[in-house]
Amino acid sequence: METNGFFNCIIKSLCFCALLGLDLSSATSPYIGKIYPGFEGSQMNWVDHNGVFLLSNNSVFALRFYNGLDVASFVLVIIHVRSSKIVWIANGTLLVRNTDKFVFDKNGNAYLENATTVVWSTDTEGKGVTSMELLDTGNLVLVGDNRKILWQSFSHPTGTLLSGQEFVEGMMLKSFPSQRNLTHYLEIKSNDVILYAGYRTPQVYWSMANDNRKTIKKSNETIFSASIVANSWNFYDQNKTLVWQFRFSPFNDVNATWAVVLTAEGSVSFMNLERGVPPRPEPLKIPQNSCGTPEPCNPFVVCSNFDIQCQCPSALSSHPNCMPQLDIPSAGIVKSPGNLSERLLWIVYKNGVDDKIDRGCSSSVPFGRDAVVTILLCI
C-alpha cells in the first residue's frame, strides 16, 4: 500500500509538472537579441506579450505579430517600442491568423505561412545562415559565419526609412492604399528622387531635383543613395560624395532615431521616434502642402494652394456634393455640362491611356483608381 501511495505521488507530481510546462509555453517570454534556426511559433505563443517574440538587445525595437482593424488577422512587423511606431512590415496586406506560424527553419530560411501558402520569405535556404538578430537600429538581419549579413530588412524597406538606413537606387518605398485605393511610391530614378502615384500609367507628382528647399552641395553629380544623418536627409553619388542635403528639422541630435514615412495620402513625413507617443511629424513635409499630392480632395473638388483647402469650383457649386451628372461614353471626349466659367474638360481613358490631353490645363484630378475619367481644370 505504501508503495502504491509513493507511485501515485510521483504520477501526480509528473502531471502537475506537465501542466505547469503547458502554462509556461502558452506565456512564452520574448527572446532578446537573436534566435536560431529551428525556431517557430504563432501569435498565440506570445499573446501575453502583445505578440512580441524578439526584442533588440536594449529593447529599442521589437519583432511582433500585430493586428490592425481586424482583431483576428495579423501582420509581422518591426515596431519602435517607445513610440509604438511600426517601421517595417513583412507580409503587407497578406494577413495571417493567430494560429499561423512564423518559421526560422534549420536550413536558414525565415518565412511566414498561413493555412495554405507562404506569404513572406527571406529566401535564404542553404546560404549558411546561423542566426537571426534584431539590432537596436531597427534592422532585422540574418547572419552567417564571420558575422556576414546574408539578408537584412534595411535592404527591403516597406513604407519607412530609419536613421542610418541606406536607401539606394533599385529600392522602393510603398505606401498603404489611400481611402480611394491609390498607392504611392518613392524611388531613386533617373538621377533624381521621385514620388509617383500608382495609376495604370504612373504619375510623378514630386521630385527632389525641383524642390528648392534642398541645399546643393555638389552640382552635376548622379544620385545613387540617400540616408538620414542627424536632422537632414542626405543624397550621395556612387562614391558616397554628398550631392544634396534636405534639412527637415531644427532639432539636431545625432542620437535621435528619425523616421522618413511615406503616408497613405502620398506625402513624406519626418518623425523623431523618441519624442511623443505617437510621435508628431515635423511641420516640414514633402510635398510642401497637401495640394501637391495626387488626390488631396474628392473628385471634382479643387485644392487651393493659397489656403490649402478643398473647394468646389463655382461652376459646380449648385450640384449636390459638387458632383455633376455625366453621361460618360466608353471612349472619346465628353463635353462640359452647361456654361462653365472655369472651363472643365473631361477626358475619358481608353485602355488605361488618355486619348487627349489639353496641355494648357494647370491641374489634374483623377477620378478614382486607374482613372476612368480625368478632370483637367483650365483657368
Feature locations, PLM:
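Beta-rich ligand-binding surfaces for carbohydrates and other polyanions
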Residues: 2-379
